[in-house]
Amino acid sequence: MVSKQQTMGFQTEVKQMLHLVVHSLYSNKEIFLRELISNASDALDKLRFLALSNGSLFENDSDLKISIQINEKLQTITISDNGIGLSWEEAVENLGTIAKSGTKEFISQLTGEQAKDSQLIGQFGVGFYSAFIVADKVTVKSRRAGLQPEDGIVWESKGDGEFTIGYEKKLTRGTEITLHLKPENDEFLSDWRIRGIISKYSDHICWPILMKKLSEEGKESKEFETVNKATALWTLQKSEISEEEYKQLYKHISHDYMDPLTWSHNHVEGKHEYITLLYIPAHAPFDLWQHEAKHGLKLYVKRVFIMDEATQFLPRYLRFVKGIVDASDLPLNISREILQDNKQVESIRAACTKRVLSMLEKMATNDKETYQKFWNEFGLVLKEGPIEDFANKEAIAKLLRFSTTASGSEKQEVSLEEYVSRMKEGQDKIYYITASSYNAAKNSPHLEIFRKKGIEVLLLSDKVDEWLVGYMNEFAGKKLQSISKGKIELGDDETSEQIKEQEKTLEPLIKHIKSVLNDRVKDVLLTNRLTDSPACVVADEQDMGLEMQRILQAAGQQVPVSKPIFEINPDHALIKRLHDIQDDNQFELWVTMLFEQAVLAEGGQLDNPADFVNRVNRLLVSS
């Protein structure tokens, strides 16, 4: 008997979600069962965890399970669990509303590919709504563990924009979802069809999934049997687990639709005993760069689920890794706070980090094509590694990939080991340039002398690169050197002597240029970097790089005041022309023009672009 029944409207976003799910995934209908079983499994996990501190929640029934029953006469499928259950408020919140951000992201990720889109519903936590792909009405009966039988609820909807909810006495805790199938979906009334779907998607679920036994004639009996393996897969030895089972477990814990690139499964014995199963995904999740997004591994203690997104077992730069840690020695009532200062957790974290880096190194060595796919998805995150993890800096550095002047492509595919192996005889530094974009780096005038001498330069255009080179100042005994900071020594004594002679000859010109630019520059020098350009701006050796200054300014950060050094090419026709200009106004016009041109070529911005345009026009008129 239902009491205090109310009719409520779905949140606008849920209406939109229902429409998308039903109409986008109709050709892959079977995924409804995968999602509902996954939700039931989560409910059992939550109950077992909460019962660690409150055993009364079991209500004298600690035999946790999922059951599926088919009623051909009524054309229904019922998925039941004796997990944590739902209260009235939870039913309204979980079944009637959804986070707007989740809806927006779900919609933006839809591709029109049935196989891919069918997996997104789990990734975005909206798997329950897949029930409406096959059902024209869904009835949910539930009672949260610990509440009175009279607090049981019944929720019902036809997926048409509203739902009803009321109280109904329920003696047992947990949730029972009944799907009233649409006539065209009667294939799911077949016992063998349902068993096949369970075998395909849910065999790895560690809770038993029960269905009624079948006689040899295929008729149901009153007895139930377990139709999945119901084993914590990660506790088995590697030899006992098939590749397909590893992949299905990954998809279950990650809600990903693609197979992982690789994985590492380890049983550790000794002072501390634990199991780790770590996966490298094939693509980045939608929330990889959202600061508030939750990342981390699933934590179990002696096979008992403790928490999702345990971030303490991997550093943040490896937040893309999915997997499981099952520890034998941690207390069952461990909290996130206790995890922070636990010596065993620190030990597991160090081991997990080394295993992930080892996995990636193996992939980079043995399967360069797959590693390149990984880098294209996660390279930007991995570049955070040397900044965060000093202990593993060398191992991470070997995994980094870059664009270079030798590769001739924006694609980041050159390792530092490759760069070092190609270094010129006598070259003792790894040269790089940072810029706001690949094209800005590739076309920088600072590269001219390096191109002439055939010296390879790393082209760094990711924002994180400025921080990366600040923390990773050498590799394989070779110092990393910015070609846009300080002096460049390329071991050419003849050129150095020539510049010294020219400095004496051109001293009056240099002084005149300094007087024009005044406090806009730290100094004016002759350059040994340029072959084709008249001038360039560089940062002093001890100053912050010009690109870093721009990044910080764009972020609204305080930037130490530092002025660039203006370097001129004495062999360029425009610099030679300065000798012949007698008019001070014209000289000032030309010098200012050359300086601002150099700032723009280096990717900088001018304080007053309109003045620059006026100067260009004046020079064009006078030429």
UniProtKB/Swiss-Prot annotation:
It comes from the Bacteria. It is found in: Cytoplasm. Pfam families: HATPase_c_3, HSP90. PROSITE patterns: HSP90. GO terms for cellular component: cytoplasm. Gene3D superfamilies: 3.30.230.80, 3.40.50.11260, Heat shock protein 90, C-terminal domain (1.20.120.790), Histidine kinase-like ATPase, C-terminal domain (3.30.565.10). One of its GO terms (molecular function) is ATP-dependent protein folding chaperone. Transmembrane segments: none annotated. Residues 337-550 are annotated as: B. The keyword Metal-binding does not apply. Keywords: ATP-binding, Chaperone, Cytoplasm, Nucleotide-binding, Stress response. Residues 1-336 are annotated as: A. The keyword Nucleotide-binding applies. Residues 551-623 are annotated as: C. SMART domains: HATPase_c. Belongs to the heat shock protein 90 family. Molecular chaperone. Has ATPase activity. Homodimer. This is Chaperone protein HtpG. It comes from Legionella pneumophila (strain Paris). The gene is htpG.
